[in-house]
């Protein structure tokens, strides 16, 4: 690869082809680019802004050089946020995944340790004694026996370790921050994604259209990368784009302090447990129900109304199904 030619094109604000960014990613994993060249690449693309095809090419490279998670069921969903909203909320997406699984839907949750908050998905899962694995037999047993499997990103996306130190040293986020939500190694056909701004919503909307999956992208207008119920929120799916108000769905408006994830991993885990045990604050429970409901709607492909999806999510908590699902998950994966 002629890296000098790539840099010249980037400096001239030219776009790279999907195959080219895939090759760039593979070259990084082979040690063909120096740290200085990787740093320059990340900086140049960040300054110009990444295109849909460029992002998809980097995604292709990560999936090709990573460990696949071949699950033996056809339809399952991942619920994830981009992170970086600096709101330090509790583990809303992760909790929602167990509510969705408790409602009878298959979930392949892809996650990692926290980058900007107190507790990420992997933190709260590990806090309960779960051992991460890339063993396909164990992964398939988990999704088939309790409806949910957890895919710890560091075991699968091998390419990320080649840029980890450089990303940490740079004083700004890079396009690698955008890749996390779209490199689930099981390649789910359904995804619900929370983004922290409308520019990201537009980008992922085009990305998902090209990937060809069923999706919902959500953004709270006040900057949360999930449905926060603190005010209006926007939802973009395969079929519609709409702004909702919490009261449109029968929910009270939440206060920002009710979403806080605590000061420690242990406090974050306590909130996670409280929601599944149906002892959480009403706002915490409602936020999880709202997020889970839109995930269920993606899985249903319009066969259920949003109100019915909300009822399914609420019942998953109220009848104890979400909690039983989590206990079975911990039992299988510890």
PLM features: what roles do these ranges have?
Residues 1-89, 103, 107, 254-259, ...:
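Acidic, glycine/proline-rich low-complexity segments that act as flexible tails and inter-domain linkers
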Residues 9, 64-69, 89, 104, ...:
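Glycine-rich anion-binding loops and their surrounding alpha/beta cores
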Residues 23, 57-60, 98, 165, ...:
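Alpha-helical scaffolding segments of alpha/beta enzyme cores, especially the outer helices
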Residues 40, 95-99, 287, 291-294:
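Short amphipathic alpha-helical face segments that pack within enzyme cores
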Residues 45, 100, 208:
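Hydrophobic pocket-lining residues that define ligand/cofactor binding sites across diverse proteins
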Residues 81, 85-142:
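A generic, well-ordered mixed alpha/beta core segment in the N-terminal half of proteins
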């Amino acid at each position: 690869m002629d890296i000098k030619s790539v840099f010249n094109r980037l400096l001239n604000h030219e776009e790279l082809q999907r195959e080219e960014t895939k090759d760039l990613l593979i070259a990084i994993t082979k040690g063909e680019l120096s740290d200085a060249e990787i740093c320059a690449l990340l900086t140049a693309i960040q300054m110009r802004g990444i295109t849909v095809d460029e992002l998809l090419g980097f995604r292709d490279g990560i999936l090709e050089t990573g460990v696949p998670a071949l699950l033996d069921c056809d339809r399952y969903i991942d619920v994830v946020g981009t992170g970086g909203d600096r709101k330090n909320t509790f583990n809303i997406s992760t909790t929602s995944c167990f509510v969705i699984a408790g409602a009878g839907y298959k979930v392949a949750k892809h996650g990692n340790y926290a980058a900007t908050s107190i507790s990420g998905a992997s933190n709260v899962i590990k806090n309960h004694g779960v051992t991460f694995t890339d063993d396909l037999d164990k992964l398939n047993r988990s999704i088939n026996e309790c409806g949910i499997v957890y895919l710890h990103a560091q075991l699968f996306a091998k390419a990320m370790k080649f840029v980890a130190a450089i990303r940490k040293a740079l004083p700004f986020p890079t396009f690698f921050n955008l890749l996390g939500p779209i490199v689930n190694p099981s390649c789910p056909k359904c995804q619900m994604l929370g983004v922290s701004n409308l520019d990201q919503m537009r980008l992922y909307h085009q990305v998902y259209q090209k990937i060809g999956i069923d999706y919902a992208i959500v953004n709270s207008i006040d900057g949360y990368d999930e449905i926060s119920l603190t005010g209006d929120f926007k939802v973009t799916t395969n079929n519609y784009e709409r702004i909702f108000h919490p009261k449109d769905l029968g929910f009270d408006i939440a206060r920002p302090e009710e979403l806080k994830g605590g000061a420690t991993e242990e406090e974050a885990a306590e909130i996670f447990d409280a929601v599944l045990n149906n002892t959480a604050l009403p706002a915490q429970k409602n936020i999880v129900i709202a997020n889970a409901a839109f995930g269920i709607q993606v899985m249903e492909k319009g066969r259920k109304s949003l109100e019915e999806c909300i009822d399914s999510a609420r019942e998953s908590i109220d009848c104890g199904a979400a909690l039983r699902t989590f206990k079975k998950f911990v039992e299988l994966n510890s």
